[in-house]
């Protein structure tokens, strides 16, 4: 059935399904430069909705938007040894401009800790200048070798938050506060269940003291890191000499954080909820929540379209995102298929017989149709959209629970990571972690904050667990 509609079934080739649905649902296309994509209006509308939600939450927590340069002197990156080592393989570097070789090469922004640190060293003098709570919406460039639309692209859009604090305690509180905002976005807006946790030393952000993350499980059993929040300690403060005088007139280094979420979150939405018929979009982030498809012959055209327009206005008045598909060149069947492919949560079918009965047919993207009084639709749909969100979340959570296993032997571990999350003890040794990755392609995703304390022995080498609880392992994007 899926193939008739032009999509490879997920069970046959999930990766191919993903690439096809992005193009056929008109989310994005490939750019002329390898590893770049063109985000089409429908895909960009999802990103705009994500932006609006996050921007509101950032401002509610006292953050302000700012913008820093795209070009960063290479000497800035070299100031923090771990940072430059972590990003060097992915850097795009400008060596010539205006027809001449530059005195100093410029990195095209891979992330902005260094340039913001430089500016803070100019702006921060006293405890009165703290905290600094900044966010930047922009693009970054990381020259990825293996690219995939939304998940890994050479250039991508994201937000990166950067904050500076007087104490470690304040900075660590900020790290968790921002991670919880990402978790809220995932659960309450994208209907994606996520695990909040701590990255291992091997997997942390280059230059961080530690990294926290939200991890989601996709329908092919692979994990996706959907957002990260880092405690940078005094690392960048020392590199860029960001000092302040505290209330006791002592000169100290600030404690900084950074946190980011990119358009790979769109990839998470696609792979958590999509099916063989196409996208299934969570209503709170969907560009179109309800599509109205009028069904008519020539003699009833005017009457049906007039009623459809009236319904559209009534739904817009409820604050819903509505589209009326009044294209004459396509059949209703073609339109049904197209809007299913594009993942619109609800479709209203309205024909002359429906009008006579003062009713309309409401079809859900999750399956099923019902006939409702036309006048009742504007009142009924907001509640139905909420129920749609809850059902999406329930299904995703059930999938995750069905594909999560506690394992205590390496054989069981190897089996578990073929289909989802493996919860296992680990010794904390980077070399052991690397061997697990080489032997199984699975990586540590996080040490979950919510997991019960539990003692045990490393699933691979048998040494005592370093974390006092099980670690989440999975193959990952």
From Swiss-Prot:
<feature type="binding site">
    <location>
        <position position="427"/>
    </location>
    <ligand>
        <name>Zn(2+)</name>
    </ligand>
</feature>
<dbReference type="Pfam" id="PF09180">
    <property type="entry name" value="ProRS-C_1"/>
</dbReference>
<feature type="binding site">
    <location>
        <position position="142"/>
    </location>
    <ligand>
        <name>ATP</name>
    </ligand>
</feature>
<dbReference type="InterPro" id="IPR004154">
    <property type="entry name" value="Anticodon-bd"/>
</dbReference>
<dbReference type="InterPro" id="IPR016061">
    <property type="entry name" value="Pro-tRNA_ligase_II_C"/>
</dbReference>
<dbReference type="Pfam" id="PF03129">
    <property type="entry name" value="HGTP_anticodon"/>
</dbReference>
<keyword id="KW-0862">Zinc</keyword>
<comment type="subunit">
    <text>Homodimer. Only one tRNA molecule binds per dimer.</text>
</comment>
<dbReference type="InterPro" id="IPR006195">
    <property type="entry name" value="aa-tRNA-synth_II"/>
</dbReference>
<feature type="region of interest" description="Interaction with tRNA">
    <location>
        <begin position="340"/>
        <end position="369"/>
    </location>
</feature>
<feature type="binding site">
    <location>
        <position position="228"/>
    </location>
    <ligand>
        <name>ATP</name>
    </ligand>
</feature>
<dbReference type="InterPro" id="IPR033721">
    <property type="entry name" value="ProRS_core_arch_euk"/>
</dbReference>
<feature type="binding site">
    <location>
        <position position="264"/>
    </location>
    <ligand>
        <name>ATP</name>
    </ligand>
</feature>
<keyword id="KW-0479">Metal-binding</keyword>
<feature type="binding site">
    <location>
        <position position="461"/>
    </location>
    <ligand>
        <name>Zn(2+)</name>
    </ligand>
</feature>
<feature type="binding site">
    <location>
        <position position="225"/>
    </location>
    <ligand>
        <name>ATP</name>
    </ligand>
</feature>
<dbReference type="GO" id="GO:0005737">
    <property type="term" value="C:cytoplasm"/>
</dbReference>
<protein>
    <recommendedName>
        <fullName>Proline--tRNA ligase</fullName>
        <ecNumber>6.1.1.15</ecNumber>
    </recommendedName>
</protein>
<dbReference type="GO" id="GO:0006433">
    <property type="term" value="P:prolyl-tRNA aminoacylation"/>
</dbReference>
<feature type="binding site">
    <location>
        <position position="262"/>
    </location>
    <ligand>
        <name>ATP</name>
    </ligand>
</feature>
<dbReference type="InterPro" id="IPR045864">
    <property type="entry name" value="aa-tRNA-synth_II/BPL/LPL"/>
</dbReference>
<dbReference type="Pfam" id="PF00587">
    <property type="entry name" value="tRNA-synt_2b"/>
</dbReference>
<feature type="binding site">
    <location>
        <position position="113"/>
    </location>
    <ligand>
        <name>L-proline</name>
    </ligand>
</feature>
<dbReference type="InterPro" id="IPR002314">
    <property type="entry name" value="aa-tRNA-synt_IIb"/>
</dbReference>
<feature type="binding site">
    <location>
        <position position="142"/>
    </location>
    <ligand>
        <name>L-proline</name>
    </ligand>
</feature>
<keyword id="KW-0436">Ligase</keyword>
<keyword id="KW-0963">Cytoplasm</keyword>
<dbReference type="InterPro" id="IPR036621">
    <property type="entry name" value="Anticodon-bd_dom_sf"/>
</dbReference>
<dbReference type="InterPro" id="IPR004499">
    <property type="entry name" value="Pro-tRNA-ligase_IIa_arc-type"/>
</dbReference>
<feature type="binding site">
    <location>
        <position position="153"/>
    </location>
    <ligand>
        <name>ATP</name>
    </ligand>
</feature>
<feature type="binding site">
    <location>
        <position position="458"/>
    </location>
    <ligand>
        <name>Zn(2+)</name>
    </ligand>
</feature>
<keyword id="KW-0030">Aminoacyl-tRNA synthetase</keyword>
<keyword id="KW-0547">Nucleotide-binding</keyword>
<comment type="similarity">
    <text>Belongs to the class-II aminoacyl-tRNA synthetase family. ProS type 3 subfamily.</text>
</comment>
<dbReference type="GO" id="GO:0046872">
    <property type="term" value="F:metal ion binding"/>
</dbReference>
<dbReference type="GO" id="GO:0004827">
    <property type="term" value="F:proline-tRNA ligase activity"/>
</dbReference>
<keyword id="KW-0648">Protein biosynthesis</keyword>
<feature type="binding site">
    <location>
        <position position="111"/>
    </location>
    <ligand>
        <name>L-proline</name>
    </ligand>
</feature>
<dbReference type="InterPro" id="IPR017449">
    <property type="entry name" value="Pro-tRNA_synth_II"/>
</dbReference>
<dbReference type="InterPro" id="IPR002316">
    <property type="entry name" value="Pro-tRNA-ligase_IIa"/>
</dbReference>
<feature type="binding site">
    <location>
        <position position="230"/>
    </location>
    <ligand>
        <name>L-proline</name>
    </ligand>
</feature>
<feature type="binding site">
    <location>
        <position position="432"/>
    </location>
    <ligand>
        <name>Zn(2+)</name>
    </ligand>
</feature>
């Amino acid at each position: 059935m899926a193939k008739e509609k032009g999509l490879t079934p997920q069970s046959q080739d999930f990766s191919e399904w993903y690439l096809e649905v992005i193009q056929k649902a008109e989310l994005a296309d490939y750019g002329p430069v390898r590893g770049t994509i063109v985000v089409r209006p429908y895909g960009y509308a999802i990103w705009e909705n994500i932006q609006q939600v996050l921007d509101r939450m950032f401002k509610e927590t006292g953050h302000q938007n700012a913008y820093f340069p795209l070009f960063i002197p290479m000497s800035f990156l070299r100031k923090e040894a771990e940072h430059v080592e972590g990003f060097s393989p992915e850097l795009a570097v400008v060596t010539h401009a205006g027809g001449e070789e530059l005195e100093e090469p410029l990195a095209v922004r891979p992330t902005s800790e260094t340039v913001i640190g430089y500016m803070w060293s100019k702006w921060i003098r006293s405890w009165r200048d703290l905290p600094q709570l900044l966010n930047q919406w922009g693009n970054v460039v990381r020259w990825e070798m293996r690219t995939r639309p939304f998940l890994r692209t050479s250039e991508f859009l994201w937000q990166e938050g950067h904050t500076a604090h007087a104490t470690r305690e304040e900075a660590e509180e900020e790290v968790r506060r921002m991670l919880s905002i990402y978790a809220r976005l995932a659960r309450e807006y994208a209907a994606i269940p996520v695990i909040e946790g701590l990255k291992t030393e091997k997997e942390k952000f280059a230059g961080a003291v530690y990294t926290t993350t939200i991890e989601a499980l996709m329908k092919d059993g692979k994990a996706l890191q959907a957002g990260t929040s880092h405690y940078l300690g005094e690392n960048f403060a020392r590199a860029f000499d960001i000092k302040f005088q505290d209330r006791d007139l002592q000169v100290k280094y600030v404690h900084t954080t950074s946190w980011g979420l990119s358009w790979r979150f769109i990839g998470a939405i696609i792979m958590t909820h999509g099916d063989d018929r196409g996208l299934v979009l969570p209503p709170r982030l969907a560009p179109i929540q309800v599509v109205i498809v009028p069904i008519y012959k020539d003699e009833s055209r005017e009457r049906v379209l007039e009623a459809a327009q009236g319904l559209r206005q009534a739904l817009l008045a409820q604050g819903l995102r509505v589209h009326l598909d009044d294209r004459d060149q396509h059949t209703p069947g073609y339109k049904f298929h197209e809007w299913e492919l594009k993942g619109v949560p609800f479709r209203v079918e309205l024909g002359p017989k429906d009008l006579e009965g003062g009713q309309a047919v409401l079809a859900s993207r999750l399956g099923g149709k019902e006939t409702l009084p036309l006048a009742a639709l504007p009142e009924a749909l907001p509640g139905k959209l909420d129920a749609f969100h809850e059902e999406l979340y329930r299904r995703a959570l059930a999938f995750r629970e069905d594909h999560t296993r506690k394992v205590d032997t390496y054989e069981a571990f190897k089996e578990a990571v073929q289909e989802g999350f493996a919860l296992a003890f680990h010794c904390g040794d980077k070399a052991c972690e690397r061997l697990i990755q080489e032997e199984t392609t699975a990586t540590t995703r996080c040490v979950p904050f919510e997991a019960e304390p539990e003692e045990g022995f490393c699933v691979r080498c048998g040494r005592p667990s370093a974390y006092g609880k099980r670690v989440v392992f999975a193959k990952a994007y």
